[in-house]
Amino acid sequence: MIEQLNEILNNFKVKLELVKDLNSWEELKKEFIGKDSSLTTILKSIKTISSDKKQEIGKLANQIRVEIINQLNEKQEQLKNKELLVKLEKEKIDVTLTNSSLKFGSKHVLNIVIEEISDIFTEIGFEMVSGTEIESDLYNFQKLNLPVDHPARDMQDTFYLDNNLVLRTHCTNMTSRMLTKLASLKTEDNNLAVISYGNVYRRDDDDATHSHQFMTNRWVCCWNKISFANLKWILKYMCQRLFNKDINIRLRPSFFPFTEPSVEVDVSCFKCDSKGCFICKKTGWIEILGAGMINEHVLKLNGLDPNKYSGLAFGIGIERIAMLKFNISNIRNFYENNVKFLEQFKFYSE
């Protein structure tokens, strides 16, 4: 067995000299110290060897394994340096060449959509507000009619930083903060009309239409005499401005813990004029957002009297709107920093 070990080491040294790239290095590593290698088999069989030779063979086998690992690491470093030099040589720039025209940047496609939506609502009196992405459980859940251990929380897989702090799962956390601020004014003639946007986080598996991080817009209005009719008008106004067509909207009953009644908002398909296509899945309608009247329990939890105040709220995913407006099929395109993809939208940002 000692001869076999020495033969393994000699064979390794010969083959190591022939290694020219990292792929063949990986194969050599697997051959000599992988789980199915001859050396590993010998190490596993040492316990079956007679005691008088066990120590000698075990010591030699481990010494050879350490030597092989050290030489592999040294060879790997050499190969990496070699590949780096080749790469640097290929990317070498002749600084004496005449400079080409400068390329100017442009707005990110998501910022284009955000600014378009913001302009629509600031024109009709909404105020922009912003908040923190790390939020307390109180404002992210409890003040939005999602008490501790309530099953409705399962609708949003959440990243917890500790028992009290989370990465916000929606921009609706600003709804509870602004309602609480309105209640603190303690006057009946105050009203609220705000819009907020930003990153939110959920434990979704990333794929073509889902991401663990995405952007949303949230709107909230709250004053003495506001009704579902006002909500419907605002929704239709926004959709017609956003998609630049005289489209129709459809409201379907739904459920959200912080609104009652709640609706899903569909728009008539602006890609096929409601005739049926792959975008609208042959239905003629595209779902774009959720909305509703603020639940009276939410008003109470934030210190407002539901007999004096009513409110409306709705939210929309920025990436979803961008995907619909610009025919983008994969949400990951927004975050890969691919200049060739992003510069397509330069025209829209000018």
UniProtKB/Swiss-Prot annotation:
<dbReference type="InterPro" id="IPR004529">
    <property type="entry name" value="Phe-tRNA-synth_IIc_asu"/>
</dbReference>
<keyword id="KW-0030">Aminoacyl-tRNA synthetase</keyword>
<dbReference type="InterPro" id="IPR010978">
    <property type="entry name" value="tRNA-bd_arm"/>
</dbReference>
<dbReference type="GO" id="GO:0005737">
    <property type="term" value="C:cytoplasm"/>
</dbReference>
<comment type="subunit">
    <text>Tetramer of two alpha and two beta subunits.</text>
</comment>
<keyword id="KW-0460">Magnesium</keyword>
<protein>
    <recommendedName>
        <fullName>Phenylalanine--tRNA ligase alpha subunit</fullName>
        <ecNumber>6.1.1.20</ecNumber>
    </recommendedName>
</protein>
<comment type="similarity">
    <text>Belongs to the class-II aminoacyl-tRNA synthetase family. Phe-tRNA synthetase alpha subunit type 1 subfamily.</text>
</comment>
<feature type="binding site">
    <location>
        <position position="260"/>
    </location>
    <ligand>
        <name>Mg(2+)</name>
    </ligand>
</feature>
<dbReference type="Pfam" id="PF02912">
    <property type="entry name" value="Phe_tRNA-synt_N"/>
</dbReference>
<dbReference type="InterPro" id="IPR045864">
    <property type="entry name" value="aa-tRNA-synth_II/BPL/LPL"/>
</dbReference>
<dbReference type="InterPro" id="IPR004188">
    <property type="entry name" value="Phe-tRNA_ligase_II_N"/>
</dbReference>
<dbReference type="InterPro" id="IPR002319">
    <property type="entry name" value="Phenylalanyl-tRNA_Synthase"/>
</dbReference>
<dbReference type="GO" id="GO:0006432">
    <property type="term" value="P:phenylalanyl-tRNA aminoacylation"/>
</dbReference>
<dbReference type="GO" id="GO:0005524">
    <property type="term" value="F:ATP binding"/>
</dbReference>
<keyword id="KW-0963">Cytoplasm</keyword>
<dbReference type="GO" id="GO:0000287">
    <property type="term" value="F:magnesium ion binding"/>
</dbReference>
<keyword id="KW-0436">Ligase</keyword>
<dbReference type="GO" id="GO:0004826">
    <property type="term" value="F:phenylalanine-tRNA ligase activity"/>
</dbReference>
<keyword id="KW-0547">Nucleotide-binding</keyword>
<dbReference type="Pfam" id="PF01409">
    <property type="entry name" value="tRNA-synt_2d"/>
</dbReference>
<keyword id="KW-0648">Protein biosynthesis</keyword>
<dbReference type="GO" id="GO:0000049">
    <property type="term" value="F:tRNA binding"/>
</dbReference>
<keyword id="KW-0067">ATP-binding</keyword>
<dbReference type="InterPro" id="IPR022911">
    <property type="entry name" value="Phe_tRNA_ligase_alpha1_bac"/>
</dbReference>
<keyword id="KW-0479">Metal-binding</keyword>
